[in-house]
């Protein structure tokens, strides 16, 4: 049994679709301005209350806002957040780091995903949430804070680590052009460098704060 891309496709009014697809730099700045305003606000409050009883609820709020970054990633990947291509790409790379999604790998795999959604026959759609064979325990762990760490080898960070060492996963071999693979490796190494820098800051300042502000939010906030 397999899934392919043959299914019902509704008719769309092209004029209405064009109106809905209109892009605006102002709307993009407004969205990201509000987003980062609240992210910085709750991050600053977490810093001020670090070690007190108020830390946990503020950190949960901060992490939940941070974990919205995949939505920002998705819109900037499609270049719909802004009218300007450069602005989309800048915020795409920022959102990619926040979401632990190496930008070049995901640009190509997401393009394939939209062309062959849920395809399991032949070339595989690697963005399927429930892969075959299905692991329901792993699926439900996604809805528990830090549940992803029960399966560390299935996290996005582990994939980036493999790419940083030059080991290309099946999704890259299948979706990315040959000339892009070295860029994926380079970007992955940059991500790992930034992670090491954050951990080093925590060690230097003898504080867990940098780790909880930049590395933990996806594990804590995404399930919430």
Report residues per predicted region:
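Juxtamembrane membrane-interface segments at transmembrane alpha-helix termini
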Residues: 67-76, 222-224
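Short active-site segment of divalent metal-dependent hydrolases/proteases
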Residues: 77-78, 117
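Small-residue-enriched core segments of transmembrane alpha-helices in multipass membrane transport
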Residues: 61-66, 213-222
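Hydrophobic transmembrane alpha-helices of multi-pass small-molecule transporters
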Residues: 39, 93, 222-223
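Non-catalytic, topology-defining segments of multipass membrane proteins
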Residues: 1-63, 72, 97-212
């Amino acid at each position: 049994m397999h899934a392919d891309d043959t299914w019902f496709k509704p008719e769309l009014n092209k004029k209405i679709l064009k109106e809905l697809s209109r892009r605006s730099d102002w709307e993009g700045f407004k969205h990201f301005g509000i987003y980062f305003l609240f992210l910085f606000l709750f991050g600053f409050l977490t810093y001020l209350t670090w070690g007190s009883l108020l830390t946990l609820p503020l950190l949960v709020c901060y992490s939940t806002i941070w974990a919205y970054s995949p939505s920002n990633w998705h819109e900037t990947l499609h270049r719909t957040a802004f009218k300007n291509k450069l602005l989309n790409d800048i915020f795409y790379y920022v959102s990619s780091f926040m979401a632990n999604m190496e930008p070049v790998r995901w640009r190509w795999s997401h393009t394939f995903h939209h062309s062959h959604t849920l395809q399991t026959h032949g070339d595989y759609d690697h963005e399927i949430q429930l892969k075959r064979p299905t692991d329901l325990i792993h699926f439900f762990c996604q809805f528990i804070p830090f549940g992803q760490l029960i399966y560390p080898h299935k996290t996005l960070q582990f994939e980036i680590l493999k790419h940083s060492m030059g080991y290309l996963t099946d999704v890259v071999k299948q979706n990315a052009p040959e000339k892009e693979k070295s860029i994926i490796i380079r970007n992955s190494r940059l991500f790992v460098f930034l992670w090491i820098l954050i951990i080093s800051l925590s060690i230097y300042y003898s504080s867990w704060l940098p780790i909880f502000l930049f590395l933990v939010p996806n594990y804590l906030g995404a399930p919430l």
